[in-house]
């Protein structure tokens, strides 16, 4: 497996535990179906079997933790914090102009949260991140806001 950071390994373990509903260390097709359903997908039995077959290297019909880690490692690849930060910024910067406006922030927050934020709360979030005072958040300001102090 590729070298994974401790954070990535913890994330993989959390994901595995979410799939492994009964906690027996294996993901069955039934457990996979439950998780897929919670994600709004309804795969057929054949699709579920195919998903498991792609990952199930020992051929026992279930996905063990080691197989899950191997699959996730292939998908994750090496982490590039700069690239991840740029991708996160792009999620907010809907029109791609390099600035996050209050309208863009409101749109993203509406998608990610059930709580409806007031215009005042959105404006406050922008103000907190907006170092140069132009009423928008540029990439450098976004990085400062997202980086733990």
Curated annotation (Swiss-Prot):
Positions of Ca(2+) 3 binding: 93, 95, 97, 104
Role summary: Not known. This protein has four functional calcium-binding sites.
GO MF entry, a single one: calcium ion binding
Protein name: Squidulin
Chain positions found as N-acetylalanine: 1
Record-linked Gene3D superfamilies: EF-hand
Binding positions (Ca(2+) 1): 20, 22, 24, 26, 31
Start and end residues of each EF-hand domain: 7-42, 43-78, 80-115, 117-149
Pfam family, one: EF-hand_7
Keywords: Acetylation, Calcium, Metal-binding, Repeat
Organism: Doryteuthis pealeii
Binding site for Ca(2+) 4: 130, 132, 134, 136, 141
Binding site for Ca(2+) 2: 56, 58, 60, 62, 67
Family the entry assigns: Belongs to the calmodulin family.
A GO cellular-component term linked to this record: myosin II complex
């Amino acid at each position: 497996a590729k070298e994974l950071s401790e954070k990535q390994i913890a994330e993989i373990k959390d994901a595995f535990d979410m799939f492994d509903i009964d906690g027996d260390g294996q993901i069955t097709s039934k457990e996979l179906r439950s998780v897929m359903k919670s994600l709004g997908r309804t795969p057929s039995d054949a699709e579920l079997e195919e998903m498991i077959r792609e990952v199930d290297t020992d051929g026992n019909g279930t996905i063990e933790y080691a197989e899950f880690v191997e699959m996730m490692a292939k998908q994750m690849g090496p982490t590039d914090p700069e690239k991840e930060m740029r991708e996160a910024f792009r999620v907010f910067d809907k029109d791609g102009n390099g600035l996050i406006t209050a309208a863009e922030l409101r749109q993203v927050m509406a998608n990610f949260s059930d709580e409806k934020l007031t215009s005042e709360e959105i404006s406050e979030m922008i103000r907190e991140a907006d170092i140069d005072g132009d009423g928008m958040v540029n990439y450098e300001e976004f990085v400062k806001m997202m980086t733990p102090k």
